[in-house]
């Protein structure tokens, strides 16, 4: 188990070596309990581990508080722990939701970072080489506080200097940006962040202070450059907010987009200032899927057909599937392929009838949009198109129109009203 601390304040004293020692005091603590799931590799003899965390109170029911009539305080620790893991990504349209979401993020991150460092030290002697064995891939901005948490662990628990901890951290952390939408580039109010994570905020302040100095040194004598505008766009702490995307870029060795065009937009528009300062950090990693999950497992009829024509090497070496090109004009292969497609549509039609009570024609075109519901994903545009087609057919029943079944699958964030209304419209 790991102990995760929230709130309180940070005291500073000097040890016998003249080093400043930072201690978090007056905090609330939660115990993180690990649960491991085996992730079995495909025919390679490798089993990886997915570790998840449950939250438990450090102190359970406080009888003294209960006997004094303070019933809320008696169960305070239990409620704190339970709330953290009750609902992932709670509605953050209000202050309490924002606070719970930040607690949630830090809880999982702190437990995981502590475990990663301890696990490394069980097998290695030199913490300075941590980055040679460990990488923290920050999947969007939600886990970015891991940067400051790793700095905290290295400095406060392993007594490294700032410079030593910073070198390790910047060689350990890498950031994946998934979207250019400003709303997804997470920001936290300073008041909330500093109150909930006082030691972490101190570290973020120092990262920001040093980075702002770097900006000033780099651009102060460059003609035509507005240094204050650079700071406004690039600072980690600015205008009362902690900007997590900025911290992820400043504090890691890699920043990647998930499609070629997306990465180009990051470099030339959205993160242009950072790209100019750190061009070597930016790269592209195009999103993809695994053929073992989405073909071999999900579509066994088609998988068997592919194997019958090109062998089974494609299961572990996807480019081998390109050998199907020679069958592109083969009438027999085309018919086999279409038969498999039809059988799968019949299977889906049965599922829809069983679970939704709707009868669909498997001979119709299945027009499918399954992804999280968001205005930029354009489900609204899609359903408006459906409504337009319906009206056209009502007005012109003589139109030559091939039957089409529209299938939507999505969920909306709890506080996202427009997305909820779009679901209502589709229904």
Language-model segments: residues:
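A conserved ligand/cofactor-binding region detector
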Residues: 1-427
């Amino acid at each position: 188990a790991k102990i995760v601390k929230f709130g309180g304040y940070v005291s500073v004293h000097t040890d016998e070596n003249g080093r400043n020692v930072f201690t978090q005091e007056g905090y609330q603590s939660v115990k993180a309990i690990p649960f491991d799931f085996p992730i079995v590799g495909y025919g390679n003899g490798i089993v990886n581990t997915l570790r998840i965390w449950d939250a438990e109170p450090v102190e359970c029911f406080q009888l003294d508080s209960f006997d004094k009539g303070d019933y809320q305080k008696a169960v305070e620790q239990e409620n704190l722990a339970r709330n953290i893991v009750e609902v992932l990504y709670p509605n953050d349209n209000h202050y309490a939701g924002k606070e719970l979401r930040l607690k949630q993020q830090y809880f999982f991150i702190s437990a995981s970072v502590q475990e990663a460092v301890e696990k490394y030290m069980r097998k290695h002697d030199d913490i300075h080489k941590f980055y040679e064995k460990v990488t923290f891939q920050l999947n969007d901005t939600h886990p970015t506080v891991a940067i400051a948490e790793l700095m905290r662990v290295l400095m406060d628990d392993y007594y490294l200097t700032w410079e030593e901890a910073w070198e390790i951290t910047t060689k350990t952390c890498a950031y994946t940006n998934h979207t250019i939408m400003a709303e997804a580039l997470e920001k936290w109010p300073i008041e909330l962040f500093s109150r909930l994570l006082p030691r972490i905020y101190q570290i973020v302040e120092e990262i920001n202070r040093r980075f702002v100095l770097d900006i000033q040194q780099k651009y102060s004598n460059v003609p035509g450059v507005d240094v204050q505008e650079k700071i406004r766009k690039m600072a980690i702490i600015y205008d009362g907010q902690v900007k997590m995307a900025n911290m992820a870029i400043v504090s890691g060795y890699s920043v990647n987009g998930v499609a070629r065009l997306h990465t180009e937009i990051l470099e030339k528009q959205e993160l242009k200032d950072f790209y100019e300062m750190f061009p070597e950090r930016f790269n592209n990693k195009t999103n993809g899927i695994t053929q073992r999950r989405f073909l071999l497992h999900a579509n066994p009829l088609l998988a068997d057909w592919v194997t019958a024509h090109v062998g089974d090497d494609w299961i572990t070496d996807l480019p081998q599937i390109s050998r199907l090109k020679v069958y592109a004009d083969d009438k027999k292969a085309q018919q086999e392929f279409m038969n498999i497609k039809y059988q799968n549509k019949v299977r889906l039609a049965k599922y829809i009838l069983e679970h939704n009570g709707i009868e669909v024609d498997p001979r119709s075109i299945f027009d499918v949009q399954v992804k999280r519901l968001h205005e930029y994903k354009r489900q609204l545009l899609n359903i408006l198109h459906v409504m337009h087609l319906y009206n056209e057919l009502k007005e012109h029943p003589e139109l030559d129109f091939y039957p089409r079944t529209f299938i939507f699958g999505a969920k909306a964030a709890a506080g996202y009203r427009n997305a909820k209304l779009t679901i209502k419209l589709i229904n």
